[in-house]
UniProtKB/Swiss-Prot annotation:
This is Large ribosomal subunit protein uL5. It comes from the Bacteria. Keywords: Ribonucleoprotein, Ribosomal protein, RNA-binding, rRNA-binding, tRNA-binding. InterPro entries: Ribosomal_uL5, Ribosomal_uL5_bac-type, Ribosomal_uL5_C, Ribosomal_uL5_CS, Ribosomal_uL5_dom_sf, Ribosomal_uL5_N. Part of the 50S ribosomal subunit; part of the 5S rRNA/L5/L18/L25 subcomplex. Contacts the 5S rRNA and the P site tRNA. Forms a bridge to the 30S subunit in the 70S ribosome. GO terms for biological process: translation. This is one of the proteins that bind and probably mediate the attachment of the 5S RNA into the large ribosomal subunit, where it forms part of the central protuberance. In the 70S ribosome it contacts protein S13 of the 30S subunit (bridge B1b), connecting the 2 subunits; this bridge is implicated in subunit movement. Contacts the P site tRNA; the 5S rRNA and some of its associated proteins might help stabilize positioning of ribosome-bound tRNAs.
Amino acid sequence: MAEAKALPRFKKLYNENIRKALLEEFKYDNEMQIPRITKVVLNMGVGEATGDSKKPAVAAEDLGLIAGQKAVITRARNSIATFKLREGMPIGTKVTLRQDRMYEFLDRFITIALPRVRDFRGLNPKSFDGRGNYAMGIKEHIVFPEINYDKVDQIWGMDIIVCTTAKTDDEARALLRAFNFPFRQ
């Protein structure tokens, strides 16, 4: 018999508290209209990849440690002579998180990584795209506890995109606030 997996803390919070609160706040007709987080995309652009082809592999390894699943190396779609970039060259790395891994990552990100960011004053509440998705950037990937600071040869920045089923930014903002995203006032 298979062992029962523990339900991630944020998933439990969403199912037990957040769904009810959003249903009351926005007066949805159907429970399927309640916004939920569908995926989290982590992206690292490696600008120095044109000079050293090993850098994207190192960045992908670090991103894999942060995300808990293997990262994919992204390649250039077209050539840009000014940047010495050729089509098909590795220029970054990304990983898409869904389901339990997504909730576990968000939990670690909000409770552990964000408080470790230097001069952190809160997330920008205007970084929504108009369709209920939220994007943010981090200047240093070493804020995550999975990264061993002594073994890091270069500090990378990264983008974190939270995709939701919310129709408007206000619904998405209410959803992320319920997950304790620390937005600036």
